[in-house]
Amino acid sequence: MAVKHKVVSLPRLNRLSPTLESTALKLMEEAGELAQAIGKLRGLSGEVCYEDTRAVMEKVTRELLDVAQTAVSMMFVLEEDYGINIEAALEEHIRKLRAKGYLSL
């Protein structure tokens, strides 16, 4: 079976001056908003969800893309401010997934 890929190409935000710390905090904030959207659908907050599933899934999608954008912003910070090679790190990440048995190529 061929391995599927989901390619997400998001821009470097050019009207912000992110730092490692500010981006990490923003990532946690966005992840919290994603969890909140999922929790609302599942009734985990104790309140009844009156929105239809499609509307909630669209909100979950928007929040997930906010998480992805912030993660990409952090990648730019790591590359530009700390000299990290994200491509090499990605290759190592794939090797790790294979070693753990999460992925076979």
Question: Residue locations for each model-derived region?
Answer:
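Flexible "arm" and connector segments at domain edges
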Residues: 1-105
